[in-house]
Regions:
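Single conserved hydrophobic/aromatic residue that forms the stacking wall/gate
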Residues: 1-12
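Signature of lipid phosphatidyltransferase scaffolds
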Residues: 6, 113-185
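Short, low-complexity, Pro/Ser/Thr/Gly-rich segments in the mature regions of secreted, periplasmic
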Residues: 187-195
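A short, well-structured juxtamembrane/interface segment
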Residues: 13-20
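Primarily the HKD phosphodiesterase
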Residues: 21-87
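C-terminal structural cap/anchor segments
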Residues: 58-60, 68-135
């Protein structure tokens, strides 16, 4: 379990996540994240909560359980959705019919962060990931426009299991195959969730 690691390598591997959290906490009004899947440990949940405690408007868009192309990411989101919502973040579930794979962050109206980092333990601890930070209102505006196009095919998840659906999005149906796959992963493979 990467949470138990205390080696110097662990400190370096967590730098991208740490720097992202610190950057997001400095936002004046808004943080918007897009990630294909979200698989966090306690350290990462604490980071998200600290951002939500510092900034009024924090949202995240990720694939819905049925729309996610990564069965492990789908199963982990299914199991941990309430914990994610418990950080205070607004979660939007993408229902576009194909798995969304964007990885970007908007901070206020000038900072854009684009790269290869998923909000998951694999990106934080195992893989070599990069995120480019750009201070430009023009790029921020263009990225926001692109992100909003995807968000118009998403529903906002509520803690009680219901959804706000301002764009009248029809959710992707969870296939029986995906449901069986998720049950297997949930029961037998989530112990290795930091590898997914």
């Amino acid at each position: 379990d990467p949470e138990m690691s205390r080696g110097l390598g662990d400190v370096y591997k967590r730098q991208v996540w740490y720097q992202l959290v610190e950057l997001m906490k400095k936002a004046d009004s808004r943080v918007k994240l897009h990630t294909p899947y979200i698989i966090c440990n306690d350290y990462m949940y604490e980071g998200l909560k600290s951002v939500c405690d510092s900034v009024d408007d924090v949202s995240l868009m990720t694939n819905s359980v049925a729309n996610n192309g990564n069965p492990f990411g789908s199963a982990d989101y299914y199991v941990n959705k309430n914990r994610i919502l418990g950080t205070g973040i607004d979660v939007w579930e993408y229902e576009g019919g194909y798995s969304y794979h964007g990885k970007s962050v908007l901070i206020d109206d000038n900072i854009s962060v684009i790269g290869s980092f998923n909000i998951d333990m694999r990106s934080a601890y195992l893989d070599t990931e990069l995120m480019l930070v750009i201070d430009s209102k023009d790029i921020n505006r263009e990225l926001n426009r692109s992100m909003e196009g995807y968000e118009m095919v998403a529903r906002k998840a509520d803690k009680d299991g219901s959804y706000d659906n301002p764009y009248n999005v029809k959710p992707v149906e969870l296939s029986s195959y995906r449901e069986r796959q998720m049950k297997l992963i949930k029961n037998f493979a989530l112990w290795a969730r930091y590898l997914f």
